Amino acid sequence: MAKRLDLKDVNIYYGAFHAVADVSLAVQPRSVTAFIGPSGCGKSTVLRTLNRMHEVIPGARVEGSVLLDGEDIYGPGVDPVGVRKTIGMVFQRPNPFPTMSIRDNVVAGLKLQGVRNKKTLDEVAERSLRGANLWNEVKDRLDKPGGGLSGGQQQRLCIARAIAVQPDVLLMDEPCSALDPISTLAIEDLIATLKLDYTIVIVTHNMQQAARVSDQTAFFNLEATGKPGRLIEIDDTEKIFSNPRQKATEDYISGRFG
């Protein structure tokens, strides 16, 4: 299920603006990679190129290669919708369909694919909610609106929705930034479990979170305002936080800037 991601000489543009320059990195299957860096450095932009989500912005384009187990997701004839099924996304703020039931929130993607068998949908809903560590909290109110859950529960519901379509990769764009510490801990524990089955890439501004949940960390930075963001360093998380190779990395994680 989990697959490897490789970026090779990736440059990202929005119209004439060069947003991110010359990114090359590898993300191993069944691991967590954290993207860190100051605001505006391009880390979320890079994350969104991993499933072509940035293409919803007019004028966006990518040069270079983004490979999923060796297959270029930007290759000729590759369907972006299929890419987004294979590489799921969990956003910064929980975004369940507020009036849709908890069950229907989870299986919304399957219904869009034409799955109508109730037994199948119920089985997927339970499996996905269990996978998101939410089943025991909602099993007696599956027909209640998803918008009635707490913030942390809503984010786990969104994770259940993402894994219901059985992706190979999960992208998480600051999934805990809108949550309280207890809900954040629940999401972090869930990430540790999910990486047994999925390749995970997470963007976070929280240095402690990156250190806790990730196997490797990539640090992005800007040379100056108006210049493209760049990958400064990527390494095992322990090395990034204890003995980074680049001074800019050390300055950022020690709080000297950012």
Swiss-Prot record:
Domain ABC transporter: 5-247
Membrane topology: Peripheral membrane protein
Catalysed reaction, written as an equation: phosphate(out) + ATP + H2O = ADP + 2 phosphate(in) + H(+)
Zinc keyword on record: no
Binding site for ATP: G37, P38, S39, G40, C41, G42, K43, S44
Subunit structure, interactors included: The complex is composed of two ATP-binding proteins (PstB), two transmembrane proteins (PstC and PstA) and a solute-binding protein (PstS).
Protein name as annotated: Phosphate import ATP-binding protein PstB
Organism: Mycolicibacterium smegmatis (strain ATCC 700084 / mc(2)155) (Mycobacterium smegmatis)
Lineage: Bacteria, Bacillati, Actinomycetota, Actinomycetes, Mycobacteriales
